[in-house]
Protein backbone atom coordinates (compact mmCIF):
# COMPACT_ATOMS: atom_id res chain seq x y z
CA UNK A 1 0.00 0.00 0.00
CA UNK A 2 1.37 3.43 -0.92
CA UNK A 3 0.93 6.85 0.69
CA UNK A 4 -1.86 7.90 -1.67
CA UNK A 5 -3.86 4.76 -0.84
CA UNK A 6 -3.40 5.32 2.89
CA UNK A 7 -4.56 8.94 2.61
CA UNK A 8 -7.53 7.94 0.44
CA UNK A 9 -8.63 5.36 3.01
CA UNK A 10 -8.36 7.84 5.89
CA UNK A 11 -10.18 10.51 3.87
CA UNK A 12 -13.05 8.08 3.26
CA UNK A 13 -13.23 7.31 7.00
CA UNK A 14 -13.27 11.05 7.77
CA UNK A 15 -16.15 11.56 5.34
CA UNK A 16 -18.09 8.65 6.85
CA UNK A 17 -17.50 10.03 10.34
CA UNK A 18 -18.60 13.55 9.37
CA UNK A 19 -21.74 12.09 7.76
CA UNK A 20 -22.63 10.41 11.07
CA UNK A 21 -22.05 6.87 9.74
CA UNK A 22 -19.56 5.98 12.50
CA UNK A 23 -21.18 6.24 15.93
CA UNK A 24 -17.93 6.08 17.88
CA UNK A 25 -14.67 8.01 18.20
CA UNK A 26 -12.09 7.86 15.44
CA UNK A 27 -8.45 8.98 15.59
CA UNK A 28 -7.22 9.76 12.10
CA UNK A 29 -3.68 10.01 10.75
CA UNK A 30 -2.18 12.34 8.20
CA UNK A 31 1.41 13.28 7.45
CA UNK A 32 3.14 10.16 8.76
CA UNK A 33 2.58 7.93 5.73
CA UNK A 34 6.14 7.87 4.38
CA UNK A 35 7.65 7.17 7.80
CA UNK A 36 5.33 4.24 8.39
CA UNK A 37 5.84 2.83 4.89
CA UNK A 38 9.60 2.93 5.50
CA UNK A 39 9.25 1.14 8.85
CA UNK A 40 6.87 -1.48 7.47
CA UNK A 41 9.39 -2.51 4.81
CA UNK A 42 11.08 -4.40 7.68
CA UNK A 43 7.86 -5.84 9.17
CA UNK A 44 7.26 -9.42 8.07
CA UNK A 45 4.00 -11.43 8.12
CA UNK A 46 5.19 -13.44 11.15
CA UNK A 47 6.00 -10.27 13.12
CA UNK A 48 3.62 -8.76 15.66
CA UNK A 49 2.54 -5.10 15.51
CA UNK A 50 0.98 -3.33 18.50
CA UNK A 51 -0.43 0.19 18.34
CA UNK A 52 -2.41 2.81 20.16
CA UNK A 53 -5.87 4.08 19.21
CA UNK A 54 -4.57 5.67 15.99
CA UNK A 55 -3.82 2.49 14.04
CA UNK A 56 -5.63 2.55 10.67
CA UNK A 57 -2.41 2.97 8.69
CA UNK A 58 -0.59 0.26 10.65
CA UNK A 59 -3.46 -2.17 10.06
CA UNK A 60 -3.41 -1.52 6.32
CA UNK A 61 0.37 -1.78 6.11
CA UNK A 62 0.31 -5.04 8.08
CA UNK A 63 -1.99 -6.54 5.46
CA UNK A 64 -5.50 -6.14 6.85
CA UNK A 65 -7.77 -5.81 3.78
CA UNK A 66 -9.27 -2.30 3.54
CA UNK A 67 -12.88 -3.57 3.51
CA UNK A 68 -12.29 -5.72 6.60
CA UNK A 69 -10.72 -2.75 8.41
CA UNK A 70 -13.51 -0.42 7.28
CA UNK A 71 -16.15 -2.85 8.60
CA UNK A 72 -14.54 -2.81 12.06
CA UNK A 73 -14.36 0.99 12.04
CA UNK A 74 -18.02 1.26 10.98
CA UNK A 75 -18.87 -1.11 13.85
CA UNK A 76 -17.36 1.42 16.27
CA UNK A 77 -14.06 -0.30 16.98
CA UNK A 78 -11.70 2.26 15.41
CA UNK A 79 -9.77 2.90 18.62
CA UNK A 80 -9.37 -0.76 19.62
CA UNK A 81 -8.72 -2.63 16.39
CA UNK A 82 -7.50 -6.20 16.81
CA UNK A 83 -6.73 -8.62 14.01
CA UNK A 84 -4.87 -11.57 15.58
CA UNK A 85 -4.73 -13.49 12.29
CA UNK A 86 -2.67 -10.61 10.84
CA UNK A 87 -0.75 -10.29 14.12
CA UNK A 88 -1.82 -6.72 14.85
CA UNK A 89 -3.35 -5.49 18.11
CA UNK A 90 -4.29 -2.03 19.35
CA UNK A 91 -5.73 -0.46 22.46
CA UNK A 92 -7.38 2.80 23.44
CA UNK A 93 -5.64 2.63 26.83
CA UNK A 94 -2.60 4.91 26.90
CA UNK A 95 0.43 2.63 27.04
CA UNK A 96 -1.81 -0.43 27.30
CA UNK A 97 -0.05 -2.38 24.55
CA UNK A 98 3.45 -1.87 25.95
CA UNK A 99 3.42 -4.66 28.58
CA UNK A 100 1.65 -6.90 26.05
CA UNK A 101 4.49 -6.25 23.60
CA UNK A 102 7.02 -7.24 26.27
CA UNK A 103 5.08 -10.45 26.94
CA UNK A 104 4.92 -11.25 23.24
CA UNK A 105 8.65 -10.59 22.97
CA UNK A 106 9.30 -13.00 25.84
CA UNK A 107 7.13 -15.62 24.15
CA UNK A 108 8.91 -15.18 20.83
CA UNK A 109 12.30 -15.46 22.52
CA UNK A 110 11.39 -18.51 24.62
CA UNK A 111 9.83 -20.36 21.69
CA UNK A 112 12.73 -19.39 19.41
CA UNK A 113 10.16 -18.21 16.87
CA UNK A 114 11.55 -16.23 13.95
CA UNK A 115 9.48 -13.14 14.70
CA UNK A 116 9.83 -9.61 16.01
CA UNK A 117 7.44 -7.37 17.91
CA UNK A 118 6.98 -3.80 16.68
CA UNK A 119 5.18 -1.47 19.05
CA UNK A 120 4.02 2.03 18.06
CA UNK A 121 3.47 4.68 20.71
CA UNK A 122 3.00 8.41 20.84
CA UNK A 123 5.46 10.98 22.10
CA UNK A 124 3.64 11.57 25.39
CA UNK A 125 3.12 7.85 26.02
CA UNK A 126 6.88 7.43 25.56
CA UNK A 127 7.36 9.56 28.69
CA UNK A 128 5.21 7.41 30.98
CA UNK A 129 6.58 5.08 33.61
CA UNK A 130 5.19 1.98 31.93
CA UNK A 131 7.01 2.90 28.70
CA UNK A 132 10.32 3.35 30.48
CA UNK A 133 9.92 0.10 32.40
CA UNK A 134 9.03 -1.84 29.25
CA UNK A 135 11.90 -0.37 27.25
CA UNK A 136 14.35 -1.16 30.04
CA UNK A 137 13.04 -4.73 30.39
CA UNK A 138 13.36 -5.30 26.63
CA UNK A 139 16.91 -3.95 26.72
CA UNK A 140 17.96 -5.95 29.79
CA UNK A 141 16.63 -9.25 28.45
CA UNK A 142 17.50 -8.61 24.81
CA UNK A 143 13.93 -9.22 23.66
CA UNK A 144 13.01 -8.89 19.95
CA UNK A 145 10.82 -5.84 20.59
CA UNK A 146 11.22 -2.59 18.65
CA UNK A 147 9.66 0.66 19.88
CA UNK A 148 8.59 3.20 17.25
CA UNK A 149 7.76 6.58 18.79
CA UNK A 150 5.41 8.61 16.61
CA UNK A 151 6.10 12.21 17.54
CA UNK A 152 3.41 14.53 16.21
CA UNK A 153 4.44 17.21 18.74
CA UNK A 154 1.14 17.04 20.57
CA UNK A 155 -0.39 15.03 23.35
CA UNK A 156 -4.12 15.23 22.73
CA UNK A 157 -4.22 19.04 22.39
CA UNK A 158 -1.08 19.89 24.39
CA UNK A 159 2.30 20.71 22.88
CA UNK A 160 4.46 17.84 24.13
CA UNK A 161 7.74 19.75 24.36
CA UNK A 162 6.14 22.62 26.29
CA UNK A 163 4.48 20.23 28.71
CA UNK A 164 7.69 18.30 29.44
CA UNK A 165 10.31 20.99 28.85
CA UNK A 166 13.15 18.69 27.83
CA UNK A 167 15.27 17.64 24.89
CA UNK A 168 14.58 14.10 23.73
CA UNK A 169 17.26 11.41 23.74
CA UNK A 170 15.32 8.80 21.78
CA UNK A 171 15.16 7.91 18.11
CA UNK A 172 11.89 9.32 16.80
CA UNK A 173 10.23 10.47 13.65
CA UNK A 174 8.19 13.63 13.58
CA UNK A 175 5.29 14.80 11.45
CA UNK A 176 2.79 17.64 11.44
CA UNK A 177 -0.71 16.42 12.23
CA UNK A 178 -2.53 19.34 10.69
CA UNK A 179 -5.34 17.71 8.73
CA UNK A 180 -7.37 16.17 11.58
CA UNK A 181 -7.97 17.10 15.23
CA UNK A 182 -7.05 14.74 18.10
CA UNK A 183 -10.34 12.86 17.69
CA UNK A 184 -12.92 12.94 14.93
CA UNK A 185 -12.60 14.35 11.46
CA UNK A 186 -13.32 18.06 11.94
CA UNK A 187 -17.11 18.11 12.22
CA UNK A 188 -18.96 17.82 15.53
CA UNK A 189 -20.92 14.57 15.28
CA UNK A 190 -23.40 13.59 17.99
CA UNK A 191 -23.60 9.85 18.72
Language-model segments: what does each one mean?
Residues 1-25:
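Cofactor-/ligand-binding subdomain signature composed of acidic, glycine-rich
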Residues 10, 33, 150:
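Acidic-residue sensor for enzyme active/binding pockets
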Residues 141-191:
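Thiamine diphosphate
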Residues 14, 21-141, 162-166:
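Cofactor-binding active-site loop characterized by glycine-rich and histidine/acidic residues
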Residues 6, 83-86, 156:
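Membrane-interacting alpha-helical segments
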Amino acid sequence: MNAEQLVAFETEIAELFNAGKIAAPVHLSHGNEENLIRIFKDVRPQDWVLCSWRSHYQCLLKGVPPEELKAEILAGRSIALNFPKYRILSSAIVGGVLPIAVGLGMGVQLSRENAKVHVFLGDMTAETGVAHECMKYVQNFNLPVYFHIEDNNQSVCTDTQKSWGFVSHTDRFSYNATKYPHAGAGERVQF
